[in-house]
């Protein structure tokens, strides 16, 4: 798999290794075993570290992110991957559909996150309309996301028919996350937001994932698939790490839209979302308190003014 390196073991024996001297002195102690891989010890997360995490049985986390300050917060929290997703269409720009956002709108968001993140890997979505026409279009769009936006990798919604797109990106030196299962950019073709991989469809998702991994994707993201399908895919792609969103806990990593998992948005959230906080309520209460203190003259007080 492209972007993954294989380290030669330091313990390989050599035919020229010195033999112990025939003396009464004690033989030197054998070299200690190599230290187990620890993702938390990695100073800058790269594709190889995610593969090592899967091999070591360690899970990693990904959150969406769209600005520098939030990137800094998530970086301090140890989140390994930040996804500048086309979900920005909904949660940042106020569009009804992710299909609306353009590449030109995505790039400034990617650049902001890249400036804020120091440890996490920044992955940028290829938005609808920026890659479908040809592998060449995909490469041109991805180059902009990396060159102008500072992304470390791109995510592409694809199936087995798009292996040449992935190969073209990888040949250009662009790490690829392949998105299979439910692909939001194809919501109309899929008949809406529906769980994928039920029954015989499970094999199709597996075939898509394997084909894209073999084409060079360093990671496979599965969205809204059954637990059985997620396990099937995770096993089938071997050493390639997997990320799930609504794909059970069998994957190597998990991803959520941060506004959903922190309770920033009102209304129903998808079944696969767990809300770890209610930031929206905190912000609303703070804004209301500010407004009331401005009206009453309590703010600004003496300690907030200059003589």
Predicted regions and their residues:
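Short, Lys/Arg-enriched N-terminal segments with co-localized hydrophobic residues
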Residues: 1-3
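Alpha/beta enzyme core
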Residues: 5-56, 60-307
């Amino acid at each position: 798999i492209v972007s993954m390196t294989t380290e030669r073991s330091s313990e390989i024996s050599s035919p020229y290794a010195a033999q112990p001297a025939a003396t009464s002195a004690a033989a030197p102690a054998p070299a200690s075993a190599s230290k187990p891989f620890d993702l938390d010890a990695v100073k800058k997360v790269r594709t190889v570290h995610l593969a090592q995490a899967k091999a070591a049985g360690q899970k990693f986390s990904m959150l969406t992110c769209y600005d520098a300050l939030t990137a800094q917060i998530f970086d301090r929290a140890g989140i390994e991957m930040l996804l500048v997703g086309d979900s920005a269409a909904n949660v940042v720009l106020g569009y009804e559909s992710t299909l609306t956002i353009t590449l030109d709108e995505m790039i400034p968001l990617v650049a902001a996150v890249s400036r804020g993140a120091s440890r996490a890997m920044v992955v940028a979505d290829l938005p609808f309309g920026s890659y479908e026409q040809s592998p060449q279009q995909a490469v041109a769009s991805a180059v902009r996301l990396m060159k102008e936006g500072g992304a470390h990798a791109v995510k592409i919604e694809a199936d087995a028919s798009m292996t040449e797109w992935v190969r073209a990106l990888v040949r250009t030196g662009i790490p690829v996350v392949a998105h299979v299962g439910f692909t939001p950019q194809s919501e109309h073709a899929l008949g809406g937001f529906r769980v994928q991989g039920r029954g015989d469809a499970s094999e199709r998702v597996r075939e898509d994932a394997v084909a894209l991994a073999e084409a060079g994707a360093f990671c496979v993201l599965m969205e809204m698939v059954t637990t059985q399908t997620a396990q099937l895919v995770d096993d089938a792609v071997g050493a390639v790490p997997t990320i799930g969103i609504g794909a059970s806990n069998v994957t190597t990593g998990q991803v959520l839209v941060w506004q959903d998992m922190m309770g920033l948005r009102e209304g129903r959230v998808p079944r696969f979302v767990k809300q770890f906080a209610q930031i929206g309520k905190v912000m609303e209460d703070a804004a209301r308190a500010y407004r009331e203190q401005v009206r009453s003259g309590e703010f600004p007080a003496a300690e907030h003014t200059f003589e």
